[in-house]
C-alpha cells in the first residue's frame, strides 16, 4: 500500500524531452476533474461594437526546474477556456498571439473532457491556438490609439513563466494598456506577465506598484505541489515573491476561486477562479463598452 501510494505521487515521465515529467497520477486526481463549476453564461444583450480581446498564450511547454528536471506544462485549459467562453458569449471575439507565433501549448492532462462549455470554445478557437499571430507583428496595432482590443487576457499554467514575464513586447503592450485605460485580465500563474513592465526598469518606477491582485500562492508551489508530485522539482523562481518585491499586494493566501478588480486589472487565484473571472470580465467589459 505504501509503495503504491509513493508511486502514484511520482511525476510521470514525458519521453518527448530529456528528463521531463508530467504531474503525478495522484496530483492529477486532486487537481483535475471531468467537469468545471461552469453554471451558465447569460448575456442577453451581447456587445456588437467590434472591439476584441487579445489572448497571449505560452508557446513553450517545458520549464527547467532547480534540480535540472523539466516540468511539462503550458497553459491550463480551464484557466484559458472558461474566461474565453464568457467573454465570447458576451460578444467579445478573441485574437490569439504567442511570442514566437508558434502554437499555444496546453496542459491537455487538465482538459475537462465532459465539460461541454469548455469543449465548445476549444473547438471554436482551435485554429487560432494552432496558428496564432506573432505578438511583435500585431504590437503596433495593439498599442495604437485606435486599437481593436478592449482587453488583453493572459491565462495561467506554469508555462507562462517561460518567456512572457521577460518579454519586451509584453512590457510595451501592458504599459500601453495601462496608459490608455484598457483592461488586463489574468489568473493563477498568469500574473507573472505583470513582471514584464519591470524589465530593464528601476523598481521604483514599476507601474503596478500598490495594485492588489489574486495569484496562485507561492506556498503551494514550494509545498504541496512538490509533495504530491505535481511538479518534478522546485521552480526556478516564484511569481508572488517577485511581484511582492515590486510592491504588488497579494490578497489571497489559499485557492478558493477568489477574483478581484483593481482599476482596470482583473485577477483570479487559480483554476478554481476561471468561471468567476470569466463572469467578472464579461460583466466589466459589457458595462464599459456596450453603450
Curated annotation (Swiss-Prot):
GO terms for biological process: DNA repair; methylglyoxal catabolic process to D-lactate via S-lactoyl-glutathione; protein repair. Keywords: Cytoplasm, DNA damage, DNA repair, Hydrolase, Stress response. The lineage of its organism: Bacteria, Pseudomonadati, Pseudomonadota, Gammaproteobacteria, Pseudomonadales. This is Protein/nucleic acid deglycase HchA. The gene is hchA. It comes from Pseudomonas aeruginosa (strain UCBPP-PA14). GO terms for cellular component: cytoplasm. Residues 1-18 have a biased composition (Basic and acidic residues). Residues 1-24 are annotated as: Disordered. Its EC number is 3.1.2.-, 3.5.1.-, 3.5.1.124. Pfam families: DJ-1_PfpI.
